[in-house]
């Protein structure tokens, strides 16, 4: 039986998609060791030029090693054809064909199968286990109806559509029966869940919370305008992780308008302050170096960031994507300036995060941590605020949910003895 190795680039949605493909392998076996694989399946990402480059490099490397390489994911529409025509790939297939992986692997001839995004395809595969066992990523929707000027993803994932609630509940129930204790709800635009089905993400979360064995629910990312009063009521519930990732993308209205974003700084501040008042950690995304971000604009944006109750951030440098409105804008920002701004933001939120952790210690807040791994004599876990904690213990703590009352604050994580 030939062995298949999955190389996954990009987001949590791609991780779930890889699990879907793995579940559909019938005449092949999956391996975690790249070198022993006969076939490499690249599940690609195309969110930035950097990810495109990393994907290309990996495809070339595998081709040089004389591996049989299949290519799928968001990169199919941006560089799949180019890599295929160069002879680096045995086959290319779009998102709609993941569940046909077993048949595709048996194809004798080279093939190129793209998606028709008008089909609004949704997978039906039930994932029976998840790598990592205790935490699982659950895709609840696909696609995005937002039209942000810088973003290429709607053109490769299609418009927003939601999985059936019954299927999601069944999927989570199955995984929890096999030891999963925490789920991370993911998708292209998670907060849009239910819009096409007369429901919403708050109602889904309430039903998920009733599943036996599920101890914590985490949400991948939300848009500010998707958080309504019904969702805010959930902040009082113990089953929801005390951390929300809210995609602001910038903290200056001029840039938000430039990006064709739906949020604005005043309402963003009001929302974040409400959430922070519930003792929640708050993360966000932030794009630096988008066309139009002058020095004065960034300085004002940075001051706004300083005053926001943020604890985590995923900042990245604007990446020019072909055929997006932003790619046609001329007032670009130098890479040197972009890097300086990126580092300034990272440093700011690093100190905010440490201050938040110190506050929790002062308030005698116990950390509720899910232990995921053991390395170098220490256990690694994530607490309810999405902060890492290292735990020294002689006990078999793997896959345990702990309440830690005594801990130390270190530079980048908390430490404890249990």
Curated annotation (Swiss-Prot):
<feature type="binding site">
    <location>
        <position position="148"/>
    </location>
    <ligand>
        <name>[4Fe-4S] cluster 2</name>
    </ligand>
</feature>
<feature type="binding site">
    <location>
        <position position="74"/>
    </location>
    <ligand>
        <name>[4Fe-4S] cluster 1</name>
    </ligand>
</feature>
<keyword id="KW-0004">4Fe-4S</keyword>
<comment type="similarity">
    <text>Belongs to the methylthiotransferase family.</text>
</comment>
<dbReference type="InterPro" id="IPR020612">
    <property type="entry name" value="Methylthiotransferase_CS"/>
</dbReference>
<keyword id="KW-0808">Transferase</keyword>
<feature type="domain" description="Radical SAM core">
    <location>
        <begin position="130"/>
        <end position="355"/>
    </location>
</feature>
<dbReference type="InterPro" id="IPR007197">
    <property type="entry name" value="rSAM"/>
</dbReference>
<feature type="binding site">
    <location>
        <position position="144"/>
    </location>
    <ligand>
        <name>[4Fe-4S] cluster 2</name>
    </ligand>
</feature>
<dbReference type="InterPro" id="IPR006467">
    <property type="entry name" value="MiaB-like_bact"/>
</dbReference>
<feature type="binding site">
    <location>
        <position position="151"/>
    </location>
    <ligand>
        <name>[4Fe-4S] cluster 2</name>
    </ligand>
</feature>
<dbReference type="InterPro" id="IPR038135">
    <property type="entry name" value="Methylthiotransferase_N_sf"/>
</dbReference>
<feature type="domain" description="MTTase N-terminal">
    <location>
        <begin position="2"/>
        <end position="110"/>
    </location>
</feature>
<protein>
    <recommendedName>
        <fullName>Putative methylthiotransferase jhp_0270</fullName>
        <ecNumber>2.-.-.-</ecNumber>
    </recommendedName>
</protein>
<feature type="binding site">
    <location>
        <position position="45"/>
    </location>
    <ligand>
        <name>[4Fe-4S] cluster 1</name>
    </ligand>
</feature>
<dbReference type="Pfam" id="PF00919">
    <property type="entry name" value="UPF0004"/>
</dbReference>
<feature type="binding site">
    <location>
        <position position="11"/>
    </location>
    <ligand>
        <name>[4Fe-4S] cluster 1</name>
    </ligand>
</feature>
<dbReference type="InterPro" id="IPR006638">
    <property type="entry name" value="Elp3/MiaA/NifB-like_rSAM"/>
</dbReference>
<keyword id="KW-0479">Metal-binding</keyword>
<dbReference type="GO" id="GO:0046872">
    <property type="term" value="F:metal ion binding"/>
</dbReference>
<dbReference type="InterPro" id="IPR013848">
    <property type="entry name" value="Methylthiotransferase_N"/>
</dbReference>
<dbReference type="GO" id="GO:0035598">
    <property type="term" value="F:N6-threonylcarbomyladenosine methylthiotransferase activity"/>
</dbReference>
<dbReference type="InterPro" id="IPR005839">
    <property type="entry name" value="Methylthiotransferase"/>
</dbReference>
<dbReference type="GO" id="GO:0051539">
    <property type="term" value="F:4 iron, 4 sulfur cluster binding"/>
</dbReference>
<dbReference type="Pfam" id="PF04055">
    <property type="entry name" value="Radical_SAM"/>
</dbReference>
<keyword id="KW-0949">S-adenosyl-L-methionine</keyword>
<dbReference type="InterPro" id="IPR023404">
    <property type="entry name" value="rSAM_horseshoe"/>
</dbReference>
<keyword id="KW-0408">Iron</keyword>
<keyword id="KW-0411">Iron-sulfur</keyword>
